[in-house]
From Swiss-Prot:
Superkingdom of the organism of origin: Bacteria
UniProt keyword annotations, A-Z: Cell inner membrane, Cell membrane, Membrane, Transmembrane, Transmembrane helix
Membrane-spanning parts: 70-90, 100-120, 213-233
Name of the featured protein: UPF0283 membrane protein YcjF
Source organism per UniProt: Salmonella heidelberg (strain SL476)
């Protein structure tokens, strides 16, 4: 049998060369580079939280504008002139034996010294607040690092700043859990799981107490002006308490700066969460029909105080939030509603008796 004819093959066109992918050059890593290797951190924060953190970082970063430099230069020149004039007056009073003028110069020197000392103290406290943000960034790097040698010293510094004694049970458990073969990420992670929750629990209790006081005060107070003054005072006290728990001593300007940062963070990231949390609870339990208007306002004020405390924790904390250890507004919401219900029931049952 004859095979079928094959089709014609035309060799007129040139052959196409197969494209081969060029190999990349070989990369070698030394022993030192392998120890300091850190994987790239993926930012999984929501868009609103990213905007809030950007606003906080921008507020923490000092702004070096031309006008500020001119003002600082003018103040420095004025201070030097005052000191020079004071020295000249003191020398003239000493030469002429004008004891009254000499006493005035001494009093002025004491006042100026006290003013300079207070300015230096405020600057040091404000610098400490900024330094806490750098420590948080360093902790975030250590939590993604495989190097060895920095984690233990960093955690011991944090414990010393927070006033945790070496004989504290949580710190003793941390010392017993770490060993030389662990890297910085594991050591800092153990500190975050064993020691840091002790301070976080104290801060949570303070937030719960202050939020409950704000809720009950607004619910029973008939004067709006008194409510505003009370809430402002209690919120400042809450910020001071949380900062003290985390080892930060606030001055006048650093307190105002922290309060402004907290309000900025709430304005960017807290409004949607607050509306969602309150709306879900009110729609599910129909509290608007059972509670008075003052009680509803009290719950709102308590939730804002709790939100303020959570953000103050986030700014004063030396470690970033890990996993799900960040306090949730819903936990405080349920606690506030339960306390308010109990208080209203007691107030209704007391007149009947």
């Amino acid at each position: 049998m004859s095979e079928p004819l094959k089709p014609r093959i035309d060799f007129a066109e040139p052959l196409k060369e197969e494209s081969t992918s060029a190999f990349k050059a070989q990369q070698t890593f030394s022993e030192a580079e392998s120890r300091t290797f850190a994987p790239a951190a993926i930012d999984e924060r929501p868009e609103d939280e990213g905007a809030a953190e950007a606003a906080v970082d921008a507020a923490l970063r000092p702004k070096r504008s031309l006008w500020r430099k001119m003002v600082m230069g003018g103040l420095a020149l004025f201070g030097a002139s005052v000191v020079g004039q004071g020295v000249q007056w003191t020398m003239n009073a000493w030469q002429t034996q004008d004891w009254v003028a000499l006493g005035g110069c001494a009093a002025g020197a004491l006042i100026i010294g006290a003013g300079v000392g207070s300015v230096v103290t405020e600057w040091r406290r404000l610098w400490r607040l900024r330094q806490r943000a750098h420590e948080r960034d360093e902790a975030r790097e250590l939590l993604h690092s495989h190097s060895v040698g920095k984690g233990r010293a960093f955690c011991e510094k944090l414990a010393q700043q927070a006033g945790i004694d070496q004989s504290h049970p949580a710190l003793q458990r941390w010392y017993a859990a770490i060993h030389e073969t662990q890297n910085d990420r594991e050591i800092v992670g153990l500190y975050a799981n064993l020691v840091q929750p002790v301070l976080d629990a104290q801060a949570r209790r303070e937030i719960s107490r202050f939020a409950a006081e704000s809720t009950l005060m607004i619910a029973v107070s008939p004067l709006a002006l008194v409510d505003m003054a009370f809430i402002a005072w209690r919120n400042l006290r809450l910020i001071n308490r949380i900062a003290t728990l985390y080892g930060i001593e606030l001055g006048y300007y650093s307190r105002l700066r922290l309060f402004r940062l907290v309000l900025l963070n709430i304005a960017f990231a807290g409004a949607s969460e607050l509306v969602r949390e309150v709306g879900m609870d009110w729609m599910s339990q129909d509290l608007a029909a059972r509670l008075s208007t003052r009680a509803a306002q009290g719950i709102g004020a308590g939730l804002l105080t709790a939100r303020l405390g959570i953000k103050a924790m986030e700014l004063c904390r030396p470690l970033p939030w890990i996993d799900n250890d960040k306090p949730r507004l819903g936990d405080f919401r349920r606690q506030l509603i339960g306390q308010l219900k109990e208080t209203l029931q007691k107030s209704k049952s007391s007149p009947e008796k």
